[in-house]
UniProtKB/Swiss-Prot annotation:
Residues 1-64 are annotated as: Domain I. Pfam families: HHH_5 (PF14520), RuvA_C (PF07499), RuvA_N (PF01330). The keyword Repeat does not apply. It is found in: Cytoplasm. Residues 65-143 are annotated as: Domain II. The lineage of its organism: Bacteria, Pseudomonadati, Pseudomonadota, Alphaproteobacteria, Rhodobacterales. InterPro entries: DNA_helicase_Holl-junc_RuvA_I, Hlx-hairpin-Hlx_DNA-bd_motif, NA-bd_OB-fold, RuvA, RuvA_2-like, RuvA_C, RuvA_C_sf. This is Holliday junction branch migration complex subunit RuvA. The gene is ruvA.
Amino acid sequence: MIGRIAGVILHRAQDHVLIDVRGVGYIVHVSERTAANLPPAGQATALYTELLVREDLLQLFGFPTLLEKEWHRLLTSVQGVGAKVALAILGTLGPDGLSRALALGDWSALRKAPGVGPKLAQRVVMELKDKAPAVMALGGALTVDPGPLPEVELVEAAVPAPVPAKAAPSSAQATADALSALGNLGYAPSEAASAVAEAAAREPAAPTAALIRAALRLLAPKE
């Protein structure tokens, strides 16, 4: 199993990147969002990877964080969602947008992804709504970048310093902490996830304490 790729980018396209690792070129499929955040050709990068094995095909899929990789695994557990459709969903919504859509039951948000129709979007929400809080709770624990980058050989012209792929925003940690706090208060995972997602949608940059207060207001009994 290949869990991480670190090397020099030889070519970057919208949906894949060719990475040279000690003379061997690996084609790694990525979302458009990830591709846009990668450094240009000639610079070093590192990605977490998932290897898809079929009878006649081996494909590598790359992710800037372990959290995004975990969301990809969860998406592909749904019937009708292949690895590339899962990438399209992540590329369209990002990990934060996906977690919010699942927690709120907003299947229309998933329809924005290429290749996702209304029936598939509804199936994804129905099957993953109760599973999403577990991944959301992992939060910042899985948003670390893929680690040190290899040195880039200087050949004739100077090559800029290696630039890692951009990691997921720190809001993932605030979300995880808020979910943990609400769980300690006795709220069900799906109930807490829905409230935290709605609170985060209203104020994306909210720190943990503010997120908890906002979620508690949403969970308070309505008069």
